[in-house]
Amino acid sequence: MAVSRAPAPDSACQRMVWLFPLVFCLGSGSEVSQSSSDPQLMNGVLGESAVLPLKLPAGKIANIIIWNYEWEASQVTALVINLSNPESPQIMNTDVKKRLNITQSYSLQISNLTMADTGSYTAQITTKDSEVITFKYILRVFERLGNLETTNYTLLLENGTCQIHLACVLKNQSQTVSVEWQATGNISLGGPNVTIFWDPRNSGDQTYVCRAKNAVSNLSVSVSTQSLCKGVLTNPPWNAVWFMTTISIISAVILIFVCWSIHVWKRRGSLPLTSQHPESSQSTDGPGSPGNTVYAQVTRPMQEMKIPKPIKNDSMTIYSIVNHSREETVALTGYNQPITLKVNTLINYNS
């Protein structure tokens, strides 16, 4: 689109001289004026261009157009267009950065938008019949959305239902942005963080969409319940894994303890015979115990009794075998073998 622009004045004096007839014309106009009731809302993208459209009323011929913008609660003139000679309009541009231009319809074009360009703008038109018409605009500058990410956490409940926590995050955004989750059919779930439950036995795969949007752009990311719950459905729940792990650890500890006890018992040997056979202490004194010979001397009672005639070699020998434990045997002999002690009991019969 072609842009018509007048040469810039060479000095401040020439600029004042050039503006004087314009001010005179504006001052001598009639008191009749009209303006748009509500400002026209315009949206621009950061770093791109925005156009504030200007449309003259039907049957009206513009003589002077002045574009103003508000800065620190005051009106600042940005562009002045003199249309006294429509074939060669004169334009004064006060923008030193040359970001302001005029289209063929005398609309205001702002290039390389910044956040500072946000604000109120007015177009003041003076017609040939000295009528003043004012158009108002509100320009908002937005940044295009980017880096939309989703996070999820799934949990398999005891009844077989998959519980899904969904979060939608828009990074590096300083402006207010609408972020929400939607179910099938564009049904809003009411926010960037939602919790849903999905039972694979009673329902098929479902899709949920996270949508983020502002005045100039929108983004969306979709997820499916089947893909989110695939991991927990194929793996046992955490509580079952914990239970199985605990049982395994306890079993291993018990097995190690039993093996250690057996090893210690084998190293110490079998239990002492005295503890295994407590009756042995009683049986060792018995005269009939095999393995030892005990000699006992028997004294005749004091009562008179008839004594038989002694016979040559009339002595009697009583053998008694006494058993000793292995430990007693080793202590007595130094050898780990049983010994047999024989004691002759002599019974003398004296007349």
Swiss-Prot record:
Effect of Y335F: Strong inhibitory signaling in germinal center formation (absence of SH2D1A/SAP)
Motif ITSM 2: where in chain: 317-322
Cytoplasmic side: 263-351
Tissue specificity as recorded in UniProt: Expressed on hematopoietic cells. Isoform 3 is expressed in thymocytes and B lymphocytes of C57Bl/6 strain.
Keyword annotations: Adaptive immunity, Cell membrane, Disulfide bond, Glycoprotein, Immunity, Immunoglobulin domain, Innate immunity, Membrane, Phosphoprotein, Receptor, Signal, Transmembrane, Transmembrane helix
Consequence the record notes for mutating Y349F: Strong inhibitory signaling in germinal center formation (absence of SH2D1A/SAP)
Glycan-modified residues: N82, N101, N112, N152, N159, N172, N186, N193, N218
The Ig-like C2-type domain, residue ranges: 147-210
Biological processes, Gene Ontology terms: adaptive immune response; innate immune response; natural killer cell differentiation; natural killer cell proliferation
Domain of life, per lineage: Eukaryota
Ig-like V-type domain: residues covered: 36-130
GO cellular component: plasma membrane
Record-annotated membrane-spanning stretches: 240-262
Mutation effect (Y349F): Decreases inhibitory signaling in germinal center formation (absence of SH2D1A/SAP)
Stretches the record annotates as Disordered: 272-295
This protein's record includes keyword Lipid metabolism: no
Subcellular location: Cell membrane
Effect of Y295F: Decreases inhibitory signaling in germinal center formation (absence of SH2D1A/SAP)
Note: Isoform 3 ameliorates spontaneous development in a systemic lupus erythematosus transfer model.
Quaternary assembly: Homodimer. Interacts with PTN6 and, upon phosphorylation, with PTN11 and SH2D1A/SAP.
Written domain comment of the UniProt record: The ITSMs (immunoreceptor tyrosine-based switch motifs) with the consensus sequence T-X-Y-X-X-[VI] present in SLAM family receptors have overlapping specificity for activating and inhibitory SH2 domain-containing binding partners. Especially they mediate the interaction with the SH2 domain of SH2D1A and SH2D1B. A 'two-out-of-three-pronged' mechanism is proposed involving threonine (position -2), phosphorylated tyrosine (position 0) and valine/isoleucine (position +3).
Protein name as annotated: SLAM family member 6
Lineage summary: Eukaryota, Metazoa, Chordata, Craniata, Vertebrata
Gene that encodes it: Slamf6
